[in-house]
């Protein structure tokens, strides 16, 4: 029994052993950083996946689903293509003299006039789209000896037959079609775009009935260029009741140049010119609805925000848009390395510093202090080191956007069948550019993330070194980001350490004296926990032995009866 009492006494002494910081003559001060229960994984130069407290997504992967009409002027083509609006298809008259920043062509657009083709359709479409206007000036061409304003039932304008409003179909007058030779100088200081064409009858009979001659010819020239077109007579697939066709051509006349038109038949003559402008206007095929909203960047899928440096919504864009990349996600670290706080810390829940883990719940700063002293425990953020890290990180996103977000537009590429090899080459070049930008984007983000993590680690180390230089021999590093302070350090003392006004000379003598008076042999926390657990187990075993001995003694005295039945 004496042995049991002695062991129990030893166990109680062990359990009652003071923790560092719980003694009135000492205190514990730990330095730590912010942590969250579930961080975000980012990529760095050295690690494919490293957890940080916070990160910002850099890839815009979705659109609004609608095209914003501000700040860009959007012109909805509705059921008209840009070329139909240019030629003056009757159902596109509403677009006469219109202007735009972006002309939106719809998939439902259709032609409703004389069937035609444009041999260099893509170039004409791109030229007019970039000009951003359908401003048309009528000129007084003199066509002597022919009938003007030809029309067709395939191109209804009101109840009667009609034709493209910007073109003049010339046919024979009586039984003659004289040779036409007309000149028109450009005395203005801007480029003029003339649209003209040639008619391809379906039969020889149609040819002679319209133009007398068995074969016509059209020559349009300037000082810089000349085009001679001969009609191809023959039947073609029927479109809107016609098997004949019109081919549309175009000529640009520079200031000081002269337009010369010579023809003996089949001429579809211009009525005037389109005033050409230089600008950033463009065209886009999209079925996204147009809405009243504000967005700098437009894609065929709809408008997208341009507050991110990259996007993978669509390769085709207009406005100040993020660069297109292949990646669905690229995360930029905007916080420090995340080390979630351990929920169980030994038998007594002792505090620990940044070397072991981070601290959750630090909402007022990234770096801070925790302490245990005679007045209890406490925590406070270090705003100076926090602000130093934030100042350097805040500009990262803006810098990445500045490097990648330029005001440009990526137009659609169109090529005819005969230009298939050019189309393949262009696609290869475009894909290579995207691959290069995707690689550059990933590398740029990885470099920035590496710098952020190194920076935040450095700020933590700076704060620790600053504290160590203040405490000097008055405290001892505990190896986990904490200091054991060998003098009484109340809350005012702790605050002086945090704000840098701590005077170690004031406490020097007390600290040195306490170093020698505190336990002769100080057990490390890991071994101490083991010994405490072993002592606890031995005590429980001895208590069980005592209880069993008491039961046996009671049975012998007859105070307890035990019946065993078999």
Swiss-Prot record:
Please provide, alphabetically and separated by semicolons, the GO molecular function terms listed in this UniProt record: host cell surface receptor binding
Spell out where lipidation (S-palmitoyl cysteine) occurs.
555, 562, 565
Membrane topology designation: Single-pass type I membrane protein
Sorted alphabetically, which keywords does the UniProt record give? Clathrin- and caveolin-independent endocytosis of virus by host, Clathrin-mediated endocytosis of virus by host, Disulfide bond, Fusion of virus membrane with host endosomal membrane, Fusion of virus membrane with host membrane, Glycoprotein, Hemagglutinin, Host cell membrane, Host membrane, Host-virus interaction, Lipoprotein, Membrane, Palmitate, Signal, Transmembrane, Transmembrane helix, Viral attachment to host cell, Viral envelope protein, Viral penetration into host cytoplasm, Virion, Virus endocytosis by host, Virus entry into host cell
| Annotated glycan sites | 24, 38, 54, 97, 181, 301, 499
Q: Where is this site: Cleavage?
A: 345-346
The GO annotation for biological process reads:
clathrin-dependent endocytosis of virus by host cell; fusion of virus membrane with host endosome membrane; fusion of virus membrane with host plasma membrane; viral budding from plasma membrane; virion attachment to host cell
Q: What does this protein do?
A: Binds to sialic acid-containing receptors on the cell surface, bringing about the attachment of the virus particle to the cell. This attachment induces virion internalization of about two third of the virus particles through clathrin-dependent endocytosis and about one third through a clathrin- and caveolin-independent pathway. Plays a major role in the determination of host range restriction and virulence. Class I viral fusion protein.
- Subunit structure comment from the entry: Homotrimer of disulfide-linked HA1-HA2.
Member of which family?
Answer: Belongs to the influenza viruses hemagglutinin family.
Write down what this protein is called: Hemagglutinin
Q: Which organism is it from?
A: Influenza A virus (strain A/Aichi/2/1968 H3N2)
Q: Which gene encodes it?
A: HA
């Amino acid at each position: 029994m004496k042995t049991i009492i002695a062991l129990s006494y030893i166990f109680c002494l062990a359990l009652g052993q003071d923790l560092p910081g719980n003694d009135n003559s000492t205190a514990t001060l730990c330095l730590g950083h912010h942590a969250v229960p579930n961080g975000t994984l980012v990529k760095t130069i050295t690690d494919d996946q490293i957890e940080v407290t916070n990160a910002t997504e850099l890839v815009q992967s979705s659109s609004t689903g609608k095209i914003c009409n501000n700040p860009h002027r959007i012109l909805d083509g509705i059921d008209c293509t840009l070329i139909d609006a240019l030629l003056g298809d009757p159902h596109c008259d509403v677009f006469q003299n219109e202007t735009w920043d972006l002309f939106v062509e719809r998939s439902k657009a259709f032609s409703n006039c004389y069937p035609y083709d444009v041999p260099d359709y893509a170039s004409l479409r791109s030229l007019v789209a970039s000009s951003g206007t359908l401003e048309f000036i009528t000129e007084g061409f003199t066509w002597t000896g022919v009938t003007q304003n030809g029309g067709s039932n395939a191109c209804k304008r009101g109840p009667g037959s009609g034709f493209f409003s910007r073109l003049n179909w010339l046919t024979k007058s009586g039984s003659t079609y004289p040779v036409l030779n007309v000149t028109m100088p450009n005395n203005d200081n801007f480029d003029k775009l003339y649209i003209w064409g040639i008619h391809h009858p379906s039969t020889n009979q149609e040819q002679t009935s319209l133009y007398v001659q068995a074969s016509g010819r059209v020559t349009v020239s300037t000082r810089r260029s000349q085009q001679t077109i001969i009609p191809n007579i023959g039947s073609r697939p029927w479109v809107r009741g016609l098997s004949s066709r019109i081919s549309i051509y175009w000529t640009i006349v520079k200031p000081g140049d002269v337009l010369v038109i010579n023809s003996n038949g089949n001429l579809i003559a211009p009525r005037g010119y389109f005033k050409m402008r230089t600008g950033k206007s463009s065209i886009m095929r999209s079925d996204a609805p147009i809405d009243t909203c504000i967005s700098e960047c437009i894609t065929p899928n709809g408008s997208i925000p341009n507050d991110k440096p990259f996007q993978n919504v669509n390769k085709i864009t207009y406005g100040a848009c993020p660069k297109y990349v292949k990646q669905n996600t690229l995360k930029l670290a905007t916080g420090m390395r995340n080390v979630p706080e351990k929920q169980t810390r030994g038998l007594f829940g002792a505090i620990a510093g940044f070397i072991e883990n981070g601290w959750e719940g630090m909402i007022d700063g990234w770096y801070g202090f925790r302490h245990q002293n005679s007045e209890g425990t406490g925590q406070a953020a270090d705003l100076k080191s926090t602000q130093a890290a934030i100042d350097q990180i805040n500009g990262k996103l803006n810098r990445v956007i500045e490097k990648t977000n330029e005001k440009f537009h990526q137009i659609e590429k169109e090529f005819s069948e005969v230009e298939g090899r050019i189309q393949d080459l262009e696609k290869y070049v475009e894909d290579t550019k995207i691959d290069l930008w995707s690689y550059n984007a990933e590398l740029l983000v990885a470099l920035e993330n590496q710098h952020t993590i190194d920076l935040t680690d450095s700020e933590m180390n700076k704060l620790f070194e600053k504290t160590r230089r203040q405490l000097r021999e008055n405290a001892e590093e505990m190896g986990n980001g904490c200091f054991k302070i060998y003098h009484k350090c109340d809350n005012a003392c702790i605050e002086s350490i945090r704000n840098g006004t701590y005077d170690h000379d004031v406490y020097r003598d007390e600290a040195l004296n306490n170093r020698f008076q505190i336990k002769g042999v100080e057990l490390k926390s890991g071994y101490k926990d083991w010994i405490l657990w072993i002592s606890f187990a031995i005590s429980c075993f001895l208590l069980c032995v005592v209880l069993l001995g008491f039961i046996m003694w009671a049975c012998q005295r007859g105070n307890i009866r035990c019946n065993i039945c078999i």
